[in-house]
Amino acid sequence: MIRQIILIVSLIGISNAAYQCKDNNGSNVDWFVFYKLPHLWNHPDNVPISNGTGFLYFDVNNKNWKLMPQGMDVENNAVYYTLQQYYNSNMNTTFSYMYNDEWPDSTIWSNSSGHAKGVTVFDQYTGFWMIHSIPKFPSKDMFRFPSNAHYYGQMGICISYNTVSLATIAQQLFYYNTFTYQFNLPQSFANQFPVLSQLKNKEYNKSPPLTSTKVLKSLGGQHFRHFAKTGEWGKDLYSDFVGPTLKSSIKVETWNHQSGDEYNLPSVCDPNHVQSTMSAKYIRLPYAIDYSSYEDHSKFVVAYSESSSKPPIPYVCIGDINRQSHQIHRGGGTMCIYDQETYFQFANIISETVPCTKATAEKATLTVLLIAIITFFK
């Protein structure tokens, strides 16, 4: 009887205090995805889209893209409700961690730390991890959608977790070298998760292995696979880690702008048609929304098959690092979900990819040949 009473009291505590992702109605949700649309002038009848705050949304309870009537700049959307828990939190009992390579409400930015953006908030029971691509977001004192985020497309994913998962989350973030602007670490969390103190002290992993992939189970039981890399690894997260690990060809949408010595990494065509990495060129969404990758700052991956006789592996990944030359020397990561319904929503979003150049195709062929020769003589 006493054990039953303790269980009931514990459940009451969880329902009253525990942090989770919230949906567009402010209700708890296991996970959600948002796709903030670019500033699209060709949708004058839709004010949020035309002013750059419109967004598509879906979550575990309704796996269909829904165009929301409100913009992301107002106080009645999933991101707002989720973050509001942090703004209303008790700092004595809440662990919170905000990182962004461009700090909000500031001109401070970093081109050497991890190219990573996110928020993680936990109490003793549960919490959430929100991974996104929005520069200068969120503010650490109140919800405000930054004006710089209106023009380009942005994406994010929020996942609810039991607090025991914070151990794995922290270990993954330890690879990033995050540019941290808010970190609240109650002593109870420091005692339970020692790596958090290292993160607070701006430490990060510098010794092999320089990459890590871990499976994380959400509060509702959904399995996600997270990929993390350090800048010291010096390779592309997508073509050198995600694709080979998933054993699949992938299409990748990331920032498609070049400047100075920072150039876009080319698409990589696998001569065996098993493990290509193709950069996005055009995006096509429901509701007659389409635009060039040049207008998008999102970072997401869609697995695909190059064989008509082999079905694609239903993986979708959402993260925060680009396929650019400079970013092979920066930390970052992506969160992948293996789910057929989610995959269906993403499968055709990347409507056209950047073709491989002759040089990259020849390099890929030579690499395969060298591997075959080395294997033969082993």
Curated annotation (Swiss-Prot):
InterPro entries registered for this protein in UniProt: DNase_II (IPR004947)
Example GO biological process: apoptotic DNA fragmentation
Recorded family membership: Belongs to the DNase II family.
Lineage of origin: Eukaryota, Metazoa, Ecdysozoa, Nematoda, Chromadorea
Disruption phenotype annotation: RNAi-mediated knockdown results in accumulation of apoptotic DNA in 1.5-fold stage embryos.
Glycosylation sites: N51, N92, N111
UniProt xrefs under Pfam families: DNase_II
EC number(s) stated in the UniProt entry for this protein: 3.1.-.-
Protein name: Cell death-related nuclease 6
Residues annotated as signal peptide: 1-17
GO MF terms, alphabetically ordered: deoxyribonuclease II activity
Alphabetical keyword list: Apoptosis, Glycoprotein, Hydrolase, Nuclease, Signal
Organism: Caenorhabditis elegans
Reported function: Involved in apoptotic DNA degradation.
UniProt keyword annotation of Hydrolase present: yes
